């Protein structure tokens, strides 16, 4: 099993190029199911979840015409098997995103209930209830969602809670429904906007993406298109947080500052100096960070996917911070691993109280999920001595060659078998 070996203490300098966003690329790949025409996706990150999704689409009947680095050309002219098996879905919960497009395009879908990260319950009931409201007949049989429908009908759907994948699934399904669909309490994430832009490029009629009310007027068919996936705002935030913790001067390219307003604000609170341009962000940090308290919430508030990285930073900050997680239960599993590095953290329910100390000490730690992996890397970069991060297969689900990018910025980090 592969591990990362990190020798802490180096400042990070130079330039890092940001990859396409996994959480934008996955629904965009699924959007290829909505048209019989050729569909091209650019700026695809090279990640395990992307490879898994492409394999799933091939099983469904999509032909991968080209799969060059960063680009995939897809043809869903013949969907022969509208099924996502448990073996395929169990490692990637985003596979649920084929449900809406398959049902809208073929009138049927047989989808295993999803797996993915072990960070708490992420129910798909909002997907199912929304599709049922559009006229689908859906049942749960032996761990599978069995869905059938004629042409879906537009309707008003008020979601009980904010769900990104639920919003994306229903938005895709509604593009081919008869009439108008109104999604209320919709997710506002930039990845939802990116998917809407992709669908509009295919001929969909969508208004309001980026707000909590999205209106979709169904059309008879969608056509082929080419779409460039947005930059990964979480990868961007992860590297910025690493520099704020370690110190240094880094410029991130091929990224967007406008998707990270709250994160950038919190980094400025730590004492970092930040400059931004149209497609770049520069962060400079010359001293020990100040602590930042935060509360995760749906976009545009502080993202849950950045909570763990900020906990690593707060572990060595000059003071005490309070961090509250409101999105997922069980998303403090990295706390016990940080404590192995001598971090001073107490967890009370969904809140962690972090008392910053001047220096973490290197040790062997184990990654429990994707963002916890990034947290432990940042902690290892600031720790004294050697840190070994085990179970890094989580990393390859969401970060493209993170150790190489950090190494080119001066980090002493390498992957070993």
UniProtKB/Swiss-Prot annotation:
- Give the species: Nitrosomonas europaea (strain ATCC 19718 / CIP 103999 / KCTC 2705 / NBRC 14298)
- HAMAP family reported for this sequence: MurA
Q: In which pathway does it act?
A: Cell wall biogenesis; peptidoglycan biosynthesis
Keyword tags: Cell cycle, Cell division, Cell shape, Cell wall biogenesis/degradation, Cytoplasm, Peptidoglycan synthesis, Pyruvate, Transferase
- NCBIfam families annotated for this entry? murA, PRK09369.1
The GO annotation for biological process reads: cell division; cell wall organization; peptidoglycan biosynthetic process; regulation of cell shape; UDP-N-acetylgalactosamine biosynthetic process
**Got a GO cellular component term for this one?**
cytoplasm
Recall the taxonomic lineage recorded for the source organism. Answer: Bacteria, Pseudomonadati, Pseudomonadota, Betaproteobacteria, Nitrosomonadales
Similarity remark? Belongs to the EPSP synthase family. MurA subfamily.
- The keyword Transmembrane helix is assigned to this record: no
According to its UniProt entry, the function of this protein is described as: Cell wall formation. Adds enolpyruvyl to UDP-N-acetylglucosamine.
What catalytic activity does the UniProt entry give for this protein?
A: phosphoenolpyruvate + UDP-N-acetyl-alpha-D-glucosamine = UDP-N-acetyl-3-O-(1-carboxyvinyl)-alpha-D-glucosamine + phosphate
Instruction: Output this protein's name.
Output: UDP-N-acetylglucosamine 1-carboxyvinyltransferase
**Binding of phosphoenolpyruvate: at which residues?**
22-23
């Amino acid at each position: 099993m592969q591990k990362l070996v990190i020798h802490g203490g180096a400042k990070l300098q130079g330039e890092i190029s940001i990859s396409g966003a996994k959480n934008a690329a996955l629904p965009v790949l699924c959007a290829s199911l909505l048209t019989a025409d050729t569909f091209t996706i650019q700026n695809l990150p090279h990640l395990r979840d992307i490879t898994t999704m492409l394999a799933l689409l091939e099983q469904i009947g999509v032909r991968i015409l080209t799969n060059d680095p960063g680009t995939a050309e897809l043809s869903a002219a013949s969907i022969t098997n509208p099924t996502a098996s448990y073996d395929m879905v169990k490692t990637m919960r985003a596979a649920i995103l084929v449900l809406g497009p398959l049902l809208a395009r073929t009138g049927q879908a047989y989808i295993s209930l999803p797996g993915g990260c072990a960070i708490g319950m992420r129910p798909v009931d909002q997907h199912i209830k929304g599709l049922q409201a559009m006229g689908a007949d859906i049942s749960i049989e032996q761990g599978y969602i069995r869905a059938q429908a004629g042409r879906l009908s537009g309707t008003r759907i008020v979601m009980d809670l904010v769900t990104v994948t639920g919003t994306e699934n229903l938005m895709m399904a509604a593009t081919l429904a008869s009439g108008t669909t109104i999604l209320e309490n919709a997710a506002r994430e930039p990845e939802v906007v990116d998917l809407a832009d992709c669908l509009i490029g295919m001929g969909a009629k969508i208004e309001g993406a980026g707000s909590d009310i999205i209106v979709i007027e169904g059309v008879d068919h969608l056509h082929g298109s080419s779409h460039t996936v947005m930059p990964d705002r979480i990868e961007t935030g992860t590297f910025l947080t690493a520099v704020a913790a370690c110190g240094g001067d880094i410029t991130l390219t091929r990224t967007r500052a406008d998707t990270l307003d709250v994160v950038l604000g919190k980094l400025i609170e730590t004492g970092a100096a930040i400059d931004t341009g149209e497609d770049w962000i520069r962060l400079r940090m010359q001293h020990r960070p100040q602590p930042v308290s935060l509360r995760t919430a749906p976009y545009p508030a502080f993202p849950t996917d950045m909570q763990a990285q900020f906990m690593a930073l707060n572990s060595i900050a000059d003071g005490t911070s309070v961090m509250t997680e409101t999105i997922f239960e069980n998303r403090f599993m990295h706390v016990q691993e940080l404590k192995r590095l001598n971090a001073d953290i107490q967890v009370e329910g969904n809140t962690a109280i972090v008392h910053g100390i001047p220096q973490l000490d290197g040790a062997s730690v184990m990654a429990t999920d994707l963002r916890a992996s990034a947290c432990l890397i940042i902690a290892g970069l600031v720790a004294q001595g050697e840190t070994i991060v085990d179970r890094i297969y989580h990393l390859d689900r969401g970060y493209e060659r993170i150790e190489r990018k950090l190494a080119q910025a001066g980090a002493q980090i390498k992957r070993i078998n």
